[in-house]
Design a protein with these regions (language model features):
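Membrane-proximal alpha-helical signals and transmembrane carboxylates
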Residues: 2-328
Length: 328
């Protein structure tokens, strides 16, 4: 190898090292990592969009969702969602990166129409947030800003509660005709996950009761334990298999559950109460525009597509539920 070749190799190696160093610095320390987007649509009182960003800087730029940098909050307002987002980004110490943005928080007064508007913006670069988990907050943008001003740890606490509630939350891309989202509330300055869930449909928003919320999650097959306070004590489903069958003009819903270890087998009266709650939840969702168990699809599979499609525009069909638990 000649001296000129060695010099060229050393030069190439030096350029590579400099490029790698610059790339790593740009990726890992020079960006504000947005962890959650908080959207508040226009209201009668405030006729503009408000966007808040939960972010970490700079350590959070590592490729780990558990980055340890301090969580902070910045807010922007604008006549459109895009201008409000741009204004919020101006409050960041560095350019925004949405690589770790896994959550979309919406005001509890948000409609499905608002979510459609948000999808249009969030699917674009650089956000690309259609896979984000959707949660609702029972507080306005002003209340959010006030809570942040009173407690410097509020953003950290908010992100922690969001993470805990995330398994119950749907992805944004799942919000075709309806969305069933957990609700965060502010109590004595602390943020917490409410027991009720919010059903957003084309016809409006409906707040489910705590029992209906648990049953809806169970019927949707969401993982985790589901507990119901009933006469005679709590009943907890550790696991549950849900089956739906079209029977004549109605439907039969069967829930076969496994109880929590160390608990007594639920009584016949408790199973009957759960059956009633199941029917009540399915009917309430249907009446508010949400086919919780995809009954229309079940009917179409059995009868074919030649007959009139069953949708929530029709009266809710008869639903009969049967709840049983395994002996072990």
């Amino acid at each position: 190898m000649t001296g000129q070749q060695r010099a060229l190799r050393w030069l190439a190696a030096g350029v590579l090292v400099l490029w790698c160093g610059g790339f790593l610095r740009a990726e890992n320390t020079e960006k504000s990592m947005v962890r959650a987007l908080i959207l508040t649509p226009p209201t009668v009182a405030v006729q503009s969009w408000m966007v808040s960003l939960l972010y970490q800087f700079p350590e959070a730029a590592a490729d780990a969702s558990d980055a340890a940098a301090k969580v902070q909050l910045c807010t922007g307002q604008g006549n459109t969602l895009q201008t409000a987002l741009t204004e919020a980004e101006r409050g960041l110490p560095r350019k925004a990166s949405y690589r770790l943005c896994e959550y979309l928080l919406l005001n509890a007064e948000t409609t499905l129409k608002t979510i459609r508007q948000a999808e249009t913006v969030l699917k674009e670069e650089p956000v690309q947030g259609l896979s984000a988990r959707v949660l609702c907050m029972d507080l306005s943008g002003e209340e959010l800003a006030a809570a942040d001003g009173e407690n410097e740890l509020f953003p950290e606490q908010l992100l922690q509660v969001v993470k805990e509630a995330a398994p119950q939350a749907p992805h944004l891309y799942e919000s075709r005709n309806a969305l069933l989202a957990p609700v965060l509330i502010l109590t004595d300055g602390a943020i917490e996950n409410a027991e009720e869930m919010l059903l957003l449909t084309e016809t409006g928003n409906t707040r489910l009761t705590p029992a209906e919320s648990q049953m809806a999650q169970l019927l949707l097959g969401q993982s985790g334990e589901h507990t119901f306070p009933l006469d005679g004590g709590q009943v907890t489903f550790r696991r549950c298999v849900v089956s739906v069958e079209a029977v004549e003009d109605g439907f039969a819903v069967t829930l076969t559950g496994q109880r929590r270890a160390g608990t007594a087998l639920p009584t016949a009266a408790q199973c009957a109460a759960l059956e009633q709650l199941c029917v009540q939840t399915v009917q309430r969702c249907w009446e508010n525009g949400y086919d919780l168990l995809s009954l229309g699809a079940v009917r179409a599979l059995k009868q074919g597509t030649g007959r009139e499609a069953l949708t929530t525009k029709n009266a809710c069909p008869q639903v009969q539920a049967d709840v049983s638990f395994l002996q072990f």
